Amino acid sequence: MKTIDLTPREREVLGIIIQAYVVSASPVSSRFIAKNYNLGLSDATIRNVMADLEDAGFISQPHTSAGRVPTDKGYRYYVDLIMMVQGIDDDEKRHIDSNLRLFTIDRKDSSEVLFAAAKVLGSISQQLSVVMSPRLSLGVFERLDMVLLSSSRIMVILSIQSLFVKTIVMELDLDVSRRQIEMVVDLLNQRLSGLTLDEIRTSIAERLADCDTDQGLLNRIVRSADELFDESPVLDRLYIAGAEYIVSQPEFDQPQKVRDLICMIEDKTRIARIVDLDGVVVPQVMTERDVSITIGRENPASTEGDFTVVTTPYFVGNTMGRLAVLGPKRMDYARVVRVVNYMADRLSTTFSDVN
């Protein structure tokens, strides 16, 4: 879509309207701008500029209000060409660092770190926050352990690069001993260590074809490769927090709006689709990762046009997870972008320290 080039005056007025609307949640009038901002322009001149912005589709007049509010087009222009993203402030940085520091890097439950990240992100942004753990199919296999639960039942524990762990209970159609399990575990770790789960899943039969160690248990592992070494369900990869903050926003002052929001939060498959889609990259953020923003109906996975989604990836070895903030289009974009960006940096660093 071609971007309309606004004049410097129009850009300044549009930026003021959006910034004022983010704070007040009330339509912004020309009189308010003339009174509170030293633009050197009369009320009438500002009103004419706002009329031009409205004609071009950047702002609109809600009902009979004397003020104007931004449209999706206005928000998009602001994010792409007006917004200035500065570094994270000291209080925000301390809040994130102190919470992630609670988790030692040798702890074997990365889910605690990811849920803590979601809670902190929701608290700072005052929006709904989502952390999606990395896709494990590209994760590097470190080791496998088995726990004998009964003579025909075992627990298989897969340790994947950077503390990610997958646990599955398997029912066997044969009896096994602890000694048999130890021999199979040693063999699997020797043959499979350093491969990705995808590589193991597609080649495990060939890699174990010449082995004569306990064929019964080995064959059961090979037959279960799709279950053992496949991707975790997306519902198990989502950590959601911040619902208590987003419902306090003026946009959710009606019961039906709250019900719609709750339905969306409970539909994790839908949340995953919304978060996992790449939006428009924010050009002002120059990092190793892209921070992207989808506004309203730009995200085809969102049935409502009332939300903005800010997302960025974080990295764990050669795998990638995602962070996201979902909130009303009337959000402090610059603040959310810098917080999401810093949180992704810290998560990537936290997990890389393990390797």
Swiss-Prot record:
Taxonomic superkingdom: Bacteria
Gene Ontology MF terms: DNA binding
InterPro entries: GAF-like_dom_sf (IPR029016), HrcA (IPR002571), HrcA_C (IPR021153), WH-like_DNA-bd_sf (IPR036388), WH_DNA-bd_sf (IPR036390), WHTH_HrcA_DNA-bd (IPR005104), WHTH_transcript_rep_HrcA_IDD (IPR023120)
Gene3D superfamilies: 3.30.450.40, Heat-inducible transcription repressor hrca homolog, domain 3, Winged helix-like DNA-binding domain superfamily/Winged helix DNA-binding domain
Keywords noted in UniProt: Repressor, Stress response, Transcription, Transcription regulation
GO biological process, alphabetically ordered: negative regulation of DNA-templated transcription
Keyword Repressor among UniProt keywords: yes
Function noted in UniProt: Negative regulator of class I heat shock genes (grpE-dnaK-dnaJ and groELS operons). Prevents heat-shock induction of these operons.
Homology family: Belongs to the HrcA family.
Name of the protein in question: Heat-inducible transcription repressor HrcA
Organism of provenance: Prosthecochloris aestuarii (strain DSM 271 / SK 413)
Highest classification ranks of the organism: Bacteria, Pseudomonadati, Chlorobiota, Chlorobiia, Chlorobiales
Record gene name: hrcA
